[in-house]
């Protein structure tokens, strides 16, 4: 399974850009395989993301903002959920990964 991070490459929001970067840096630092899905360029990907976020996790107003995180086709959460899991040291559970990726011996 691959972690998919739905993001907006051309967002004018500094906050969104920082949040996207934080998620990607965490995944890279922990050697977690991931795929970036740019919803600004592909309408079908944006619509897929909207349809696959559980109704109880949608914002009360407007559309869900990036980054949105999936494990393959299973919704994990948004940035706030990711941040909370990072703070409570439960990111691997949040990402629905069995364990940390194996570290290579140097």
Curated annotation (Swiss-Prot):
CDD domains: GRX_SH3BGR (cd03030). One of its GO terms (cellular component) is nucleus. Pfam families: SH3BGR. GO terms for molecular function: SH3 domain binding. Its main location: nucleus. Keywords: Nucleus, SH3-binding. The keyword NAD does not apply. The keyword Nucleus applies. Gene3D superfamilies: Glutaredoxin (3.40.30.10). A motif (SH3-binding) lies at residues 61-67. It is found in: Nucleus. Belongs to the SH3BGR family. This is SH3 domain-binding glutamic acid-rich-like protein 2. It comes from Xenopus tropicalis (Western clawed frog).
